[in-house]
Swiss-Prot record:
Key word Transmembrane present: yes
Entry protein name: Uncharacterized protein RP867
Annotated Gene Ontology cellular component terms: plasma membrane
Organism in which the protein naturally occurs: Rickettsia prowazekii (strain Madrid E)
GO-annotated biological processes: proteolysis
InterPro entries, sorted: Aspartic_peptidase_AS (IPR001969), Clan_AA_Asp_peptidase_C (IPR011969), Peptidase_aspartic_dom_sf (IPR021109), Retropepsin-like_bacterial (IPR034122)
Keyword terms: Cell membrane, Membrane, Transmembrane, Transmembrane helix
Taxonomic lineage from the root: Bacteria, Pseudomonadati, Pseudomonadota, Alphaproteobacteria, Rickettsiales
Transmembrane segments: 6-26, 39-59, 66-86
Membrane topology classification: Multi-pass membrane protein
GO molecular function terms noted in the UniProt entry: aspartic-type endopeptidase activity
Length: 231
């Protein structure tokens, strides 16, 4: 950037600052000044005179170059401001795109909210930390409590031979005997303690996340292909 262009920028910036100060001074000390059309015309005529001096001082090429650079910076500034103003919407849009690419994708928001995308088979899946062990669940609002597969129960340290299968649960495949258990800690976004669950004699393909945990959230809802949990 040559010296003449730097000088041009300095003069334009100075003109803008002086104009702003002058406008504020007049508006504060003479509140009725800008209510009269004649005074407004005079004020803008002064601005026109200032810019005319600038145009007469510099060549058209330098003016065009300055205006182009000024426009570029204005666009950059506008993009930054727009991105900041719509940062939450952009954050949501980003995760929606990822959820379309990755089935059962889960993300958290800043307001204590977990959002889970529906998988291709129509179900919602979520990973939870149960007693410090990672377990994958399928969300089942029809299940009264958490149902663990035999494999997951063993991961958590339960001895299947010592469990008491004293309860009867109704499943899609009929009645099933199960042993009631208590899960000391389940972490999904936040920690929930003493959650009711059971281990059945039947063969589950995947552990089920039932109402004994879902009802501990502040709220949950299904919005189209999203499961939204609030904690």
């Amino acid at each position: 950037m040559n010296k003449r262009l730097i000088k041009l920028i300095f003069i334009v910036c100075s003109t803008v600052i002086v104009t702003g100060v002058l406008y504020k001074y007049i508006n504060q000390n003479y509140p009725k000044f800008f209510k009269e059309s004649q005074n407004i015309v005079s004020f803008y005529a002064l601005l026109l005179l200032l810019f005319s001096i600038i145009y007469s001082t510099f060549s058209r090429k330098e003016i065009r170059r300055f205006c182009f650079q000024l426009a570029m910076w204005a666009v950059i500034f506008l993009v930054i401001i727009t991105g900041y103003a719509f940062r939450f919407e952009l954050h949501y849009a980003y995760h929606r795109v990822i959820s379309a690419l990755i089935p059962s994708y889960k993300w958290s928001t800043e307001v204590g909210e977990i959002i889970i995308a529906r998988s291709g088979d129509g179900h919602f899946y979520i990973n939870a930390c149960v007693n410090n062990v990672k377990i994958k669940f399928m969300v089942d609002t029809g299940a009264s409590d958490i149902a663990l597969t035999k494999e997951d129960a063993q991961k958590l340290g339960f001895d299947l031979n010592k469990l008491k299968y004293t309860r009867t649960y109704l499943t899609a495949n009929g009645e099933n005997k199960a042993a009631p258990i208590i899960l000391n800690s389940v972490v999904i976004g936040t920690e929930f303690k003493n959650i009711k669950g059971h281990v059945g004699l039947g063969n589950l393909d995947i552990s089920l996340l039932g109402m004994s945990l879902l009802e501990r959230f502040k709220g949950f809802r299904i919005d189209k292909d999203l499961l939204i949990l609030n904690y």
